[in-house]
Amino acid sequence: MKRTYQPSRVKRNRKFGFRARMKTKSGRLILARRRAKGRSKLTVSDEKKKY
């Protein structure tokens, strides 16, 4: 059986990246909540690795 998590950096950034969050009102609310909580990484885009 194929496992459910098949990692892809492109798909991950398109769905959960900073620009994806900024596109929608609810996404901006997520960012606002995470800022208020004091998260060091707001989105997966902040996990800066060599792509």
Swiss-Prot record:
InterPro entries in the cross-refs: Ribosomal_bL34, Ribosomal_bL34_CS
CC per GO annotation: ribonucleoprotein complex; ribosome
GO terms under biological process: translation
Keyword vocabulary terms for this entry: Ribonucleoprotein, Ribosomal protein
Record bears the keyword Signal: no
Top-level taxon of origin: Bacteria
GO molecular function terms attached to this record: structural constituent of ribosome
NCBIfam families in the cross-refs: rpmH_bact
Family to which this protein belongs: Belongs to the bacterial ribosomal protein bL34 family.
Record protein name field: Large ribosomal subunit protein bL34
Source species: Borrelia duttonii (strain Ly)
